[in-house]
Amino acid sequence: MPLLTLYLLLFWLSGYSIVTQITGPTTVNGLERGSLTVQCVYRSGWETYLKWWCRGAIWRDCKILVKTSGSEQEVKRDRVSIKDNQKNRTFTVTMEDLMKTDADTYWCGIEKTGNDLGVTVQVTIDPAPVTQEETSSSPTLTGHHLDNRHKLLKLSVLLPLIFTILLLLLVAASLLAWRMMKYQQKAAGMSPEQVLQPLEGDLCYADLTLQLAGTSPQKATTKLSSAQVDQVEVEYVTMASLPKEDISYASLTLGAEDQEPTYCNMGHLSSHLPGRGPEEPTEYSTISRP
């Protein structure tokens, strides 16, 4: 019985020392994506001891997140930092970039031989308020998305139309080229007679020298002079147009001066190709009265 009372007394004294040697806020609130600061105060005599910040509702199972180095230099680990102000006997814990999962029970503690000193701090995280920029960003994104869809719809309509127009132009150009080629082939396939065919209405008139039958060319010249005196009528021959390289001659012979003149229409078309040599024979035609 006296031994049990002694244990209870020691436990009460130990708990009293824990509570009175270090103090801190009971509850601390923070905003999501924000930060919070916790200040813990300790009594004189603990300035050079190590201070720590741990997480967990159970004292023995809490996980130390950050610890001082025994000086006033700030120590940071991940999103948590701690700094000891030994003159004011306070150490400050800062948690940054808060998340909803950071809400839990934490401890402000002092490391010492035997049981450490500590006090609990309840941390709660409130949702961050929705700003006006975030609210207006959704319609902007929606409008931008709709604008992109509208542009894509226009392209889906215009591209087939442009392709169809280009295809029609290509077909039209092909037909035009085919017809021109066919026309050239048809023109190249014309016969020489068609190429050399004279135009209608193109008449050639030639003055023909009249010779009497049975006379030589010299006598014919003399007789022609006398015939001119007697106003002998001159015969005319209508001839079709001939190529320049084809030369035709016509000779007319009269039996007597009192005989009536004879008229003859002569036409000669060359069936030979253009460009024949000058050595080709000359054609002559003689017309006599019966």
From Swiss-Prot:
InterPro entries: CD300_family_receptors (IPR050671), Ig-like_dom (IPR007110), Ig-like_dom_sf (IPR036179), Ig-like_fold (IPR013783), Ig_sub (IPR003599), Ig_V-set (IPR013106). The keyword Cell membrane applies. Belongs to the CD300 family. It comes from Homo sapiens (Human). Phosphorylated on tyrosine. The gene is CD300LF. Residues 1-19 form the signal peptide. One of its GO terms (molecular function) is identical protein binding. Disulfide bonds join 40-108, 54-62. Residues 178-290 are cytoplasmic. GO terms for cellular component: plasma membrane. Acts as an inhibitory receptor for myeloid cells and mast cells. Positively regulates the phagocytosis of apoptotic cells (efferocytosis) via phosphatidylserine (PS) recognition; recognizes and binds PS as a ligand which is expressed on the surface of apoptotic cells. Plays an important role in the maintenance of immune homeostasis, by promoting macrophage-mediated efferocytosis and by inhibiting dendritic cell-mediated efferocytosis. Negatively regulates Fc epsilon receptor-dependent mast cell activation and allergic responses via binding to ceramide and sphingomyelin which act as ligands. Residues 20-156 are extracellular. Highly expressed in spleen, peripheral blood leukocyte and monocyte, and lung. Weakly expressed in thymus, heart, brain, placenta, liver, skeletal muscle, kidney, pancreas, prostate, testis, ovary, small intestine or colon. Expressed selectively in monocytes and monocyte-related cells. This is CMRF35-like molecule 1. Residues 267-290 are annotated as: Disordered. Interacts with PTPN6/SHP-1 in a tyrosine phosphorylation dependent manner. Interacts with IL4R.
